[in-house]
Swiss-Prot record:
GO CC field: cytosolic small ribosomal subunit
HAMAP family the record matches: Ribosomal_uS9_B (MF_00532_B)
Designated gene of the protein: rpsI
Organism in which the protein naturally occurs: Leptospira interrogans serogroup Icterohaemorrhagiae serovar Lai (strain 56601)
Annotated keywords: Ribonucleoprotein, Ribosomal protein
Signal peptide: none
Protein name: Small ribosomal subunit protein uS9
Gene Ontology BP annotations: translation
InterPro entries with a match to the protein in the record: Ribosomal_Su5_D2-typ_SF, Ribosomal_uS9, Ribosomal_uS9_bac/plastid, Ribosomal_uS9_CS, Ribsml_uS5_D2-typ_fold_subgr
């Protein structure tokens, strides 16, 4: 019997990068060598957001996923995981692409933190102005 075909994909969000390895299996998802529930501290809404491309296509139990995520915080990492999963699932089965694209999961979210400008406290916050 031939070994299961592995597909790699990369997803990004803010400063986070997620590398996903997907292959046919039983639905086991690991993130940085931990179960996804342990890595995302059992927060159901965040876990559901991360695996939305799989639940949209109803294939949560058909593929094993091994993810490596670096950089950023929780929101960025979840967005990067979602982006990587969407790309990987489209590479493994091209017929899934229209449904995933329609939901916007293949589009890299371009929003980044705005840089701090000199003379200001933050990116846009200046010093308080007193008229008198």
């Amino acid at each position: 019997m031939a070994p299961a075909k592995e597909i790699w994909a990369v997803g990004r969000r803010k400063t986070s990068v997620a590398r996903a390895k997907i292959k046919e299996g039983s639905g086991k998802i690991t993130v940085n060598h931990k179960d996804i529930k342990d890595y995302l501290q059992n927060r159901k809404a965040i876990i559901e957001e991360a695996i939305r491309p799989l639940s949209l296509l109803n294939v949560q139990d058909k593929y094993d996923l091994n993810l490596n995520v670096t950089g950023g915080g929780t929101t960025g990492q979840v967005g990067a995981i979602r982006h990587a999963l969407a790309r990987a699932i489209c590479r493994i089965k091209p017929e899934f692409r229209p449904a995933v694209k329609k939901e916007g999961f293949l589009t890299r979210d371009p929003r980044m933190v705005e840089r701090k400008k000199y003379g200001l406290h933050k990116a846009r916050r200046g010093t308080q102005f007193s008229k008198r």
